[in-house]
Amino acid sequence: MEFKHVLMILGVIILTLAPLIMYSGLGEDEGYFGGADGAAGDLIMEISPNYEPWFEPFWEPPSGEIESLLFALQAAIGALIIGYFFGYNKAKYDDQN
């Protein structure tokens, strides 16, 4: 295995482990992984207590796990689209050369 591949693998391992070491088990209770929506809503209510939202969501997931699943599914679909785009362009470039 070439040296640059070893460096790349070590870089991936470091990038994977760094957040786990930095937060060392602290989670949502301490606010590390709180969503921006909740923080923004709290700030709006603090600034203007009489504010009324324009609309309500037509469906809310029944649990946080389902919400996380939908978010992960959305990220996976986006990654597939981006991967397809890069693969398509790479194959097109290789065919031209």
From Swiss-Prot:
Keyword Transmembrane helix in annotation: yes
Topological type in the membrane: Multi-pass membrane protein
Pathway: Cofactor biosynthesis; adenosylcobalamin biosynthesis
Keywords: Cell membrane, Cobalamin biosynthesis, Cobalt, Cobalt transport, Ion transport, Membrane, Transmembrane, Transmembrane helix, Transport
A cellular component term, taken from the record's GO annotations: plasma membrane
Record-annotated membrane-spanning stretches: 6-26, 68-88
Subcellular location: Cell membrane
GO process terms (BP): cobalamin biosynthetic process
InterPro entries reported in the protein's UniProt record: CbiN
GO molecular function terms listed in the Swiss-Prot or TrEMBL record: cobalt ion transmembrane transporter activity
Similarity comment: Belongs to the CbiN family.
Function noted in UniProt: Part of the energy-coupling factor (ECF) transporter complex CbiMNOQ involved in cobalt import.
Subunit organization: Forms an energy-coupling factor (ECF) transporter complex composed of an ATP-binding protein (A component, CbiO), a transmembrane protein (T component, CbiQ) and 2 possible substrate-capture proteins (S components, CbiM and CbiN) of unknown stoichimetry.
NCBIfam families linked to this entry: cbiN, PRK02898.1
Cited PANTHER family: COBALT TRANSPORT PROTEIN CBIN
Protein name: Cobalt transport protein CbiN
Gene giving rise to this polypeptide: cbiN
